[in-house]
Amino acid sequence: MTAIEPQNLEKHTPMMRQYLTLKAQHPDMLLFYRMGDFYELFYEDAKLASELLGISLTARGKSGGDPIPMAGLPYHAVEGYLAKLVQLRVSVAICEQIGDPATSKGPVERKVVRIVTPGTLTDEALLQERQDNLLAALYQGKSGYGYATLDIASGRFVITELANTEALEAELQRTNPAELLYSEDFSQMSLIAGMNGTRRRPEWEFDFDTCQRLLLNQFGTKDLNGFGIEGARLSLQAAGCLMQYVKDTQRTALPHINSIVRFNQTDSIVLDAATRRNLELTVNLQGGHTNTLASVLDSTVTAMGSRMLQRWLHQPLRDHQVIKARQSSIAELIATENYQLLAEDLKALGDVERITARIALRNARPRDFARLRQALGLLPQLQQTLKASSEPHLQYLSQVIGEFPEELALLSRAVVDNPPMLIRDGGVIRDGYDAELDEWRVLSAGATDYLTQLEAREKEQTGISTLKVGYNRVHGYYIEVSRRESDLVPLSYQRRQTLKNTERYIIAELKEHEEKVLSSQGKALALEKQLWEELFDLILPKLHELQEFATAAAELDVLCNFAECAETLNYACPELSDASGIHVEAGRHPVVEQVSQSPFIANPVTLNSQRKMLIVTGPNMGGKSTYMRQIALITLMAHIGCYVPAEHAVIGPVDRIFTRIGASDDLASGRSTFMVEMTETANILHNATPNSLVLMDEIGRGTSTYDGLSLAWSAAEYLANNLNAMTLFATHYFELTQLPEQIKNVENVHLDAVEHGDSIVFMHAVQEGPASRSYGLQVAALAGVPNSVICAAKQKLHHLESRDHALEQSKNGEMAVQQTISFPTQPTSPVIEALEKLNPDELTPRQALDYLYNLKKMAR
């Protein structure tokens, strides 16, 4: 997308000189150059646009002696093309004709009036309705990183200081910016190499004094201490660069960006990049949005509520007071059943958050004002429902939402009921709003009566039966007569146009009327556009209150949504404790239970000061990973204020959640699966604390058995002895089940299965103690591995077991390295085998019923 250097411009045509000059000012963007009813692209821009948009690439004569590659698209279809380019993270500078072709000497004057970049979108047609669209800036200093994000479609401006690359990677994944600005001397390019929408900025744009001055001017303050961001030097440098970029691209005032918030990592539970990925909070492992936690929890009725819910999921809170306020609100909404009534009102509010931003940027469209009017009209009814609640947090939200009777009255007077999409052709301002506009409209509309009278009079005076008065945009008003009666036309008629069967004429009186009508229409449209601009000025003083109303309404939407989830999905309110630990009775995986075809087997977990680590064993496909993930998700849900899928839950303080579950090659960085696994493990061992929840699944698989077992043993030992973190450690290394004998506060649990012949039934119920077998060969058979391979594997297994048994005896019972798996030569009844393993005292009534159904299935 680089521009041709504007050297030797005199060899080009005047129009191309104009184009090349404008292109040189926007070298890293596509330049849409307006020519009549088309936007044209030239040279490399044309080639790239042709490739990306599938439009024809042609040539437009020559300039400077060379053919000019050219591609064009109609101006009325530009939004659709912009949407495609935005999805590809391509920026566009839109150049319009601002001069009058009739009076211009040489090329019509043009200038860039709009810049569209992936991170600065506000147009409804270009934005994902239920996702934040963030512009971010990143600055690297000696002590760490400064990071700033801005959602220009809402005005939300956030900064944070990050100590290391792990924290930066997690923040980049959490925020997922549409566009990222970074300094020329940024050294950790591997962190952002795979991201789209990255944009390199000169070092001087991050100068601290310049950035601070920019922010002070934006907020209209003498210092930044009132925002609680003192000492955040690196992130202020990032914020200043971001602010300059927004000013350069928007080219208008930004009144909705009126504050800045510092996000401290200590305010929320820290989730690293691997944890966000493995827990599939908003994006699944395949990159889609189905079967995620958000897909289960999100029944919000507004887009702004949905976006807030996703932010909550990625930032679970540590402040128990805020969480309890949310819980109390949900309980009240359930008890009164008001969540259903409120949801109906909220559904009609629309996306007030983004509408107010467009009003602030003065690029709102007529229908935005109509939607805002509708939203304001619903507030009395919404407030009536909220007033029935005595819950303090709901009362607070009611107060912030407020009512706007003056703005509602203004919009009701000013804007028609069903306005057109654009102000361009008028028809937006309601009759009766402005007396002068009404006068011009009456004069313009009165033309119809006058023309009818003129036509009747001329017919009578001339005796021409075919005479009629008409109008078109090219020739204006005319009198039309058939060719066979044209000899009856008076001398005062001046011929204007000859057609095949008719002649068209003009008379002085009609010409005078035409000038008056066209003048009145033009003046009416000009005045209407002026009144339209004044409407922005009348609404903007209430901008801050409208933004607060939108934020409070979004939160109310999320809380009503949580109330509905609790009722329809049988969730319970978790108890928040100051004592370290996690206790869950009959917990369920919130996503798996919704997509599973069979009843979900609920399971408990207890982690406390006497029981800090659970060694989880059991067969492949037995449910170990699901069990561990559900504990993490229940913990996370509790810390956003949501009820949880369990009969009862008590959750203590949690500062971090780590997951080391599954891995794949990182080809872009040249890291093997094992290297990725060890990197994630190292991050956990360096950063976990006694209040961290750690999920470790199959550590050490990617290397030799001895290496893998040694690493898994040492990692588990370090977590238990040195870090004392709350840990679930799943493994197929059966030797690890001996850890509870050597380390206090470590216990064994397992998920079992029952084998009958060549079939296997997974019980999915967590029981105390270690598993007896892994059933790897049976799972391989279920997966479709050829029978000959399974048979050969059984023979090899028997050989290895015999060898290990002999070795074990020769070493007087020393721990064997290979996991011992035996197959009974004479299989007993699966029902008897299952009953022998059953401990009825450990089962809940629901688990007992599920167990009974499984026994009946095995007995068939």
Swiss-Prot record:
Gene Ontology molecular-function annotations: ATP binding; ATP-dependent DNA damage sensor activity; damaged DNA binding; mismatched DNA binding
Spans traversing the lipid bilayer: none
InterPro entries: DNA_mismatch_repair_MutS, DNA_mismatch_repair_MutS-lik_N, DNA_mismatch_repair_MutS/MSH, DNA_mismatch_repair_MutS_C, DNA_mismatch_repair_MutS_clamp, DNA_mismatch_repair_MutS_core, DNA_mismatch_repair_MutS_N, DNA_mismatch_repair_MutS_sf
Keyword match Phosphoprotein: no
GO biological process, one term: mismatch repair
Sections of the chain in a coiled coil: none
One cellular component (GO) term of this entry: cytosol
Keywords, in A-Z order: ATP-binding, DNA damage, DNA repair, DNA-binding, Nucleotide-binding
Ligand binding (ATP): 618-625
Family affiliation: Belongs to the DNA mismatch repair MutS family.
Function description: This protein is involved in the repair of mismatches in DNA. It is possible that it carries out the mismatch recognition step. This protein has a weak ATPase activity.
Protein name listed in UniProt: DNA mismatch repair protein MutS
UniProt organism field: Shewanella piezotolerans (strain WP3 / JCM 13877)
Taxonomic placement: Bacteria, Pseudomonadati, Pseudomonadota, Gammaproteobacteria, Alteromonadales
